[in-house]
Swiss-Prot record:
Any one Gene Ontology molecular-function term assigned to this protein's record: protein serine/threonine kinase activity
Residues holding ATP: I93, S94, T95, G96, G97, Y98, G99, I100, V101, K117
EC class name: transferase
Known catalytic reactions: L-seryl-[protein] + ATP = O-phospho-L-seryl-[protein] + ADP + H(+); L-threonyl-[protein] + ATP = O-phospho-L-threonyl-[protein] + ADP + H(+)
Protein keywords: ATP-binding, Host endoplasmic reticulum, Kinase, Late protein, Nucleotide-binding, Phosphoprotein, Serine/threonine-protein kinase, Transferase
Compartments, record wording: Host endoplasmic reticulum; Host endoplasmic reticulum-Golgi intermediate compartment
Organism (species): Vaccinia virus (strain Copenhagen) (VACV)
E.C. no: 2.7.11.1
InterPro entries: Poxvirus_ser/thr_kinase (IPR008790), Prot_kinase_dom (IPR000719), Ser/Thr_kinase_AS (IPR008271)
Name of the protein described by the UniProt record: Serine/threonine-protein kinase 2
One GO location term (cellular component): host cell endoplasmic reticulum-Golgi intermediate compartment
Keyword flag Cytoplasm: no
Sequence similarity: Belongs to the protein kinase superfamily. Ser/Thr protein kinase family. Poxviruses subfamily.
Length: 439
């Protein structure tokens, strides 16, 4: 195993490693602390033995378990008010197209399966190197609007995650079949299973059964019951039919309060905003200022995030005002939260070229590509924006597109507006609450 602590983009040109080599970028103490709590080599008995185990149960024996007082509240879904993390476990909080994310204590741990046949381990470090590079080079408070990983482990064997998923899936299948008095089988229909699981997951009786069987059958400190349907969609998607869940990266992040898309009117007001639309203006303005300051840096006018959307913006506590200077103006944020850009997996900047997007983009793009996509996703996430005529009309300037040049909100053609377009946009009265401190 190698260790590299330099946060400069030179990571991109480190010598290639053997297939079995692992490397740690960033803080080794954070990383090793997390790894010490994971069993990457846990194995389970063959599934046929699990099937035979469940033959010892029927509806009557399950009913007796349901009548017990014991319940592990960590097996409720996290959005359920009854959920409580009673153990120091890894709790599944999200699975997207490219990563499986867990929470433990005040950390977020992201596992990313990488296509090792397409990229060397050092070609998959953008999620660590790009934000670290930007943070080290930005000079003002704008650097506070970036989420930097504390550590990243490259080229780790991650087969245990897929094995764990299959074990939990088989347990749920057999448990549901036993509850319904059906013949036990490990064959399943995706549609039928998801319907049965979603119907039961919020039931206190079902959670009591999970409280009994998860420790007995799974015996792991990784709890994947929360949002299990997302993990199901990830592993069962047809595009991953022949996927090798072999190696990938492990990334350690600070724990955020929320992702930006989780804020509704009630929460926006609780956070101190006058309305949901004012909150949306807040995150838009902070992201715009971040991009403008990045584009001021030497050789950074090629910066692309490539996935700028509300769920890739995280909210953190802000204990002091954030002040960002631009020309003769200063933008003052006295809110008790700040927004910060996250998930740089497909990003590029300066000389850090990301092969994951280089091969996908057929034409040249700049900041406008990101904000075109950002505005589309904002309008989709928050239809309330339309109630503010001035703001919604202004945002439409970013999405003057047609089906021929825009596909699923992403530009297919090269539109290279200068960054001055964005600078002028944020000087409007729309953002007067923050310009010069609202004076």
């Amino acid at each position: 195993m190698g260790v590299a602590n330099d946060s400069s983009p030179e990571y991109q040109w480190m010598s290639p490693h053997r297939l079995s080599d692992t490397v740690i970028l960033g803080d080794c103490l954070y990383f090793n602390n997390i790894m010490s709590q994971l069993d990457l080599h846990q194995n389970w008995a063959p599934s046929v033995r699990l099937l035979n185990y469940f033959k010892n149960f029927n509806r009557e024996t399950l009913l007796k378990i349901e009548e017990n007082d014991y319940i592990n509240s960590s097996f409720f879904q996290q959005k359920d008010k009854r959920f409580y993390p009673i153990n120091d476990d890894f709790y599944h909080i999200s699975t997207g197209g490219y990563g499986i994310v867990f929470k433990i204590d005040n950390y977020v741990v992201k596992f990313v399966f990488e296509a090792t046949k397409l990229y060397s381990p050092m070609e998959t470090t953008a999620e660590f190197t790009v934000p670290k590079f930007l943070y080290n080079n930005l000079k003002g408070d704008e650097k506070k609007l970036i989420v930097c990983a504390w550590a990243m482990g490259l080229n780790y064997k991650l087969t245990f995650l897929h094995t764990l998923y299959k074990r939990v899936l088989h347990m749920l299948l057999l448990l549901i079949q036993t509850m319904d008095g059906q013949e036990l089988s490990l064959r399943y229909s995706s549609k039928v299973f998801l319907k049965a699981f979603n119907e039961r997951k919020d039931s206190i009786k079902f959670v009591k059964l999970l409280s009994h069987f998860y420790p007995a059958v799974i015996n792991s400190n990784i709890n994947v019951i929360n949002y299990f349907n997302r993990m199901f969609h990830f592993f069962e998607h047809e595009k991953r039919t022949n996927y090798e869940y072999e190696r990938g990266n492990i990334i350690i992040f600070p724990l955020a309060l929320y992702s930006a898309d989780k804020v509704d009117t009630e929460l926006a007001i609780k956070l101190g905003f006058k309305s949901l639309v004012q909150y949306i203006k807040f995150i838009f303005l902070q992201m715009a200022l971040l991009y403008i300051k990045i584009y001021e840096l030497p050789c950074c006018d090629n910066f692309l995030h490539a996935d700028l959307k509300p769920d890739n913006i995280l909210l953190f506590d802000s204990n002091e005002p954030i002040i960002i200077h631009l020309k003769d103006k200063k933008f003052v944020f006295n809110e008790r939260i700040k927004s910060a850009l996250n998930d740089f997996d497909f990003s590029q900047v300066a000389g850090i070229i990301n092969k994951k997007i280089k091969n996908n983009f057929k034409v040249k793009h700049n900041w406008y590509y990101d904000f075109h996509f950002f505005v589309h996703t904002l309008l989709k996430t928050y239809p309330e924006i339309e109630k503010d005529i001035e703001f919604s009309t202004a945002l439409e300037e970013f999405i003057m597109c047609t089906k021929t040049d825009c596909d699923k909100y992403r530009l297919k053609v090269s539109i290279l507006h200068p960054i001055s377009f964005l600078e002028k946009f944020i000087m409007r009265d729309i953002f007067s609450d923050w310009i010069n401190g609202g004076n």
